Regions:
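Conserved beta-alpha junction segments in alpha/beta enzyme cores
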Residues: 33-191, 195-372, 385-548
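Glycan-recognition surfaces in beta-rich domains, encompassing non-catalytic CBMs
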Residues: 381
């Protein structure tokens, strides 16, 4: 056992070093051929992919499974907190239907955040927050068409990601409250805004090596409690879960009647594809809802933005929730309006804005890009033409999915309890991860596809926007998911109700070819090569079962 344990440590150290290496480019599908050098490089990386997967898979077999991993036969949808949504698909507004919405926003920062004991959720390097630059919040909108089918909760938490386990803990608290007050809710959804410089909401930045080392012994002894040193991280999780439940309660109490409007907004002026594959004119548009209360009180905007929240650097050592905070702030200052921002198919999409920091203090300079980007996004929302009033028709469904990881790094992360996703074992002892996806439609005109992972734009909108870029030379066989329901335009929400890494098109999954070749480490945080096609197929099946 000691020899095997040493191999585990050695491999993880070597793998961490690999993440800092060099550059090779994917090729486009329409190219007639590939150079000999590219063929050699691809062959090398493909071989390396097999070696790495073989090594990590072997480590997973050596590493004891946590005692609370269950057999798939013991899986219970209600017990784990899955919600199926509404029973029927409404094709029009019934008499008496009307929109109502309530909003709430709370800080999720603990009072002792300045004491240097909480982790920033950026990477495995155990970065500690030394203070606060702006805030870290949960924002919630509760929406209903008052058809008697149940309301929908849309929540967004400033964070890199949220595990399904924690989302379902929030659900349990909300459902208990709703039962207590007699409030019917059909769907409870929480997204991570994907801010890279806030406290760790997922667990990925909390003492990786300590969990790796002590987790082996804990698992072998059947112990399920956290390893020593996790007290602050565990407290923060419980705190943001409690604050999220409280925010939903406040939003329910805030509900009032009004009108709901929709518009599509072009944010491409301030967004770019870091890979250079998606041209400005092909950057997907943003969906935006605007709720206007009958009482004349503050409006609420809900937007999905296809842009990474990486304008404020985690290297500052301060909690900063990036452009989301300043977009929210600008809307409030200008109109008093509320905001729920959920992430679109963010993939490698990032900011494209230049800020003149001449004359700024070091403190001002830190947040200059985030402030400017948030303000520009807010201006575009305020300038939008919200003249398209939506009929009070709300449709929502969810589908349970069971994912077999092709990337054993994800299994290892669960084995060492780096993340707390629930894992079940099939009859052959293979790990399965339960998760979910959803479909949320407004007015029979526009909808959100709710996805448990971080989609690349081309995986959702089809790879024409990347000129058919492929790693393995095959084609991506799916059309845009945005047109899956006739008469409805659909937009993606990523990292919602779970955080299962990146979702590329199957044919452009290169793993080490991108990690080493292009210094893009996304695929180390992916379920595997076929995650894209798996989710797309499950999505179409969900739609076919619901929209009849």
């Amino acid at each position: 056992m000691k020899k095997g344990f040493t191999k585990i440590i050695s491999f993880v150290l070597c793998f961490a070093m690999l993440l800092s290496c060099g550059s090779v480019v994917s090729f486009a599908a329409e190219e007639s051929g590939v150079s000999f050098g590219d063929s050699i490089a691809k062959g090398f990386y493909n071989a390396l992919n097999g070696i790495v997967e073989g090594l990590v898979s072997a480590i997973c077999k050596l590493y004891p499974n946590p005692a609370d991993w269950q057999n798939l036969s013991d899986y219970d949808s209600d017990e784990v907190g899955f919600m199926a949504g509404r029973d029927t698909y409404q094709k029009g507004a019934e008499e008496g239907n009307f929109w109502s919405l309530g909003y709430a926003s709370l800080s999720i920062l603990p009072d002792d955040v300045d004491e240097g004991k909480y982790n920033l959720g950026r990477d495995l390097m155990n970065k500690i927050a030394e203070g606060v630059y702006d805030d870290q919040r949960v924002r919630v909108a509760v929406i209903d068409d008052n058809s008697g089918e149940g309301a929908v909760v849309m929540g967004a938490i400033d964070g890199m990601g949220l595990t399904s386990t924690d989302v379902r803990a929030i659900r349990a608290g909300v459902l208990a409250y709703c039962e207590e007050i007699g409030f019917d809710v059909a769907s409870i959804n929480f997204s991570a805004t994907h801010a890279h410089s806030v406290l760790d909401t997922q667990g990925v930045s909390t003492e990786f090596f300590k969990k790796l080392l002590l987790g082996f012994a804990y698992n072998a002894m059947g112990k399920t409690e956290s390893v020593p040193g996790m007290e602050a991280a565990d407290y923060f999780k419980q705190y943001f879960i409690a604050q999220s439940i409280e925010a939903v309660k406040l939003a329910i109490a805030d509900m009032e009647s009004g009108k709901l409007y929709f518009d599509e907004i072009d944010f491409s002026e301030f967004i770019k594809d870091k890979r250079g594959l998606i041209a400005k004119e092909d950057v997907p548009a943003t969906a935006a809802l605007c709720f206007v209360p009958d009482s004349g009180s503050e409006m609420t905007y809900i937007t999905d933005i296809t842009c990474h929240a990486t304008s404020f650097s985690a290297s500052n050592g301060l909690v900063g929730s990036d452009y989301i905070y300043y977009m929210d702030q600008y809307l409030k200052e200008q109109t008093g309006a509320n905001l729920v921002m959920v992430p679109g198919a963010v993939g490698q999409m990032s900011r494209d804005i230049e800020v003149d920091t001449t004359g700024m203090t070091e403190w001002e300079d830190m947040g200059a890009s985030a402030k400017a980007l948030g303000a520009e996004f807010a201006k575009l929302v305020l300038a939008a033409d919200f003249s398209n009033e939506l009929d009070p028709v709300l449709n929502v469904t969810h589908k349970e999915i069971f994912i077999t990881p092709e990337n054993s790094i994800l299994v290892l992360a669960c084995e060492i309890r780096l993340v707390n996703n629930k894992v079940f074992l099939d009859n052959n002892g293979n790990a399965l991860m339960p998760s979910e996806m959803g479909y949320l439609e407004f007015g029979n005109e526009f909808a959100f596809a709710i996805m448990p992972a971080e989609f690349y734009p081309e995986t959702f909108w089809d790879d024409e926007i990347t000129n058919g870029t492929t790693w393995d030379g095959t084609e991506w066989p799916y059309d845009s998911l945005s047109e899956a329901v006739e008469g409805v335009t659909i937009y993606p929400i990523s990292i919602t109700n779970d955080a299962l890494g990146y979702v590329l098109t199957d044919n452009n999954f290169a793993f080490m070819g991108h990690i080493i070749g292009e210094e893009i480490a996304d695929e180390v945080l992916s379920v595997g090569k076929h995650m894209g096609s798996f989710l797309v197929e499950e999505y179409y099946e969900m739609i076919a079962d619901f929209v009849k």
